[in-house]
C-alpha cells in the first residue's frame, strides 16, 4: 500500500472553482467599502489648516519640475508665488518663459551655476547668502502664498548657509504660507521639519545614455 507523505495528511484541497461575477463584484465592493471607511476616517482626522513645508530630494530627475507643477496649481487657485533659485543661473528656460507672463509670480535667478563650473567657493557662498536674503524677505511677506526655494539643499551641503538659521526662518513664516524646497541630499534636520518629503530615485536617465539635455525636457 502506498504511503502518504506526512505533510499531506488532513491538508484541505485548494479550491479551483471559478468565482462567479456576482460573488467577485460583492467581494470587491466589500473591500472598497472597508478601504473607504479607513480613508474617510483619515480625512476627518486631518482637520488642521496651515501652510505646509515640502521637500523634493533624491538623485532622480524632476524635483524642480514637480515644484513648478505645484506652482501652476497654486496660480489656478488665485495664489501668489515666488521662486528663488540658489544654483541655477540660466534665464532662458522654458519655465521662466512661461511663468514670466503670470503677474502673480516673482522669479529670482540668483545662482552662479554648477560648482564645478564656478570653482570659486567664496563666490558661490556669497551668491547663496544673497539668495537667502531674498528668500527671507518672502518668508516675512504674508502676501506670498507659495515660495519655492530651488536647489536650496546644496547651500547646506557646501556650507554656504547655516541650517539652524534657515530652519528658524522657515518656522517663523506666515502661518498659511507654503514652501517647497528642492535639491539632492536634504539634511535630516530639514527632513524632520518638513510636512511632506519626496525622495526621487533615479532608475534611468537619458544623459547616461548619451542623450543631450533637450528643450522642454531639461530646460
Question: Where in this protein do the model-derived segments appear?
Answer:
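Short glycine- and Lys/Arg-enriched binding-loop motifs that mark or flank ligand-binding interfaces
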Residues: 47, 56-58, 74, 179, ...
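Generic detector of well-ordered alpha-helical packing
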Residues: 86, 151-152
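Conserved P-loop
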Residues: 52-140
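Residue-level preference for short coil/turn positions at secondary-structure junctions
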Residues: 49-50, 77, 143, 175
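Short gly/ser/thr-rich secondary-structure transition/capping motifs
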Residues: 36-39, 129-133, 179-182
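Extreme N-terminal, non-catalytic leader segments
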Residues: 2-52
Amino acid at each position: 500500500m502506498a504511503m502518504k507523505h506526512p505533510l499531506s495528511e488532513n491538508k484541505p484541497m485548494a479550491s479551483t472553482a471559478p468565482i462567479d461575477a456576482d460573488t467577485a463584484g460583492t467581494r470587491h465592493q466589500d473591500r472598497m467599502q472597508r478601504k473607504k471607511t479607513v480613508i474617510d476616517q483619515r480625512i476627518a482626522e486631518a482637520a488642521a489648516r496651515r501652510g505646509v513645508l515640502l521637500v523634493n530630494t533624491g538623485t532622480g530627475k524632476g524635483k524642480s519640475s514637480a515644484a513648478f507643477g505645484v506652482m501652476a496649481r497654486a496660480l489656478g487657485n488665485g495664489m501668489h508665488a515666488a521662486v528663488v533659485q540658489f544654483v541655477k543661473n540660466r534665464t532662458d528656460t522654458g519655465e521662466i518663459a512661461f511663468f514670466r507672463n503670470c503677474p502673480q509670480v516673482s522669479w529670482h535667478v540668483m545662482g552662479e551655476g554648477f560648482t564645478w563650473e564656478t570653482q570659486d567657493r567664496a563666490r558661490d557662498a556669497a551668491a547663496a547668502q544673497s539668495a537667502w536674503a531674498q528668500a527671507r524677505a518672502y518668508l516675512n511677506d504674508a502676501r506670498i502664498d507659495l515660495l519655492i526655494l530651488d536647489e536650496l539643499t546644496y547651500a547646506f551641503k557646501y556650507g554656504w548657509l547655516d541650517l539652524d538659521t534657515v530652519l528658524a526662518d522657515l518656522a517663523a513664516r506666515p502661518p498659511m504660507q507654503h514652501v517647497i524646497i528642492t535639491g539632492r541630499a536634504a539634511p535630516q534636520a530639514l527632513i524632520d521639519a518638513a510636512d511632506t518629503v519626496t525622495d526621487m530615485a533615479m532608475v534611468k536617465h537619458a544623459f547616461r545614455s548619451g542623450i543631450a539635455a533637450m528643450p522642454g525636457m531639461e530646460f
